[in-house]
Amino acid sequence: MIQPQTRLNVADNSGARELMCIRIIGASNRRYAHIGDIIVARRNPKGTRVFGAIAHELRELSFTKIVSLAPEVL
C-alpha cells in the first residue's frame, strides 16, 4: 500500500530516479494507493516559495524554476 509522503523508485525512462506521493487521487475516503495505480509526476515543483539559499549545482542540473524562486544561490 502506498500512502502520502511515501518515496518511490521510478521504473520508466522519464529520467527521474525517485518521487514522492503527495496525495491520493480519487475518492476522498481512500487512504492508500495500490500497486497498479497511476502516479502523475511532473518536474515542476508543487510550491511557489523557496526559503533560504540553494546550492549552485541546481543551476548546472537545469532546475531553473527553483533557481529563479530562491533568494540566493551559493
UniProtKB/Swiss-Prot annotation:
Keyword rRNA-binding annotated: yes
SMART domains in the record: Ribosomal_L14
Subcellular location as annotated: Plastid, Chloroplast
An example Gene Ontology molecular-function term: structural constituent of ribosome
Pfam families tied to this protein: Ribosomal_L14
GO terms classed as biological process: translation
Keywords: Chloroplast, Plastid, Ribonucleoprotein, Ribosomal protein, RNA-binding, rRNA-binding
Keyword Disulfide bond tagged: no
Coiled-coil ranges from the UniProt annotation: none
Gene3D superfamilies on file: Ribosomal protein L14
A cellular-component GO term for this protein: chloroplast
Record family assignment: Belongs to the universal ribosomal protein uL14 family.
Task performed by this protein: Binds to 23S rRNA.
Subunit comment: Part of the 50S ribosomal subunit.
UniProt protein name: Large ribosomal subunit protein uL14c
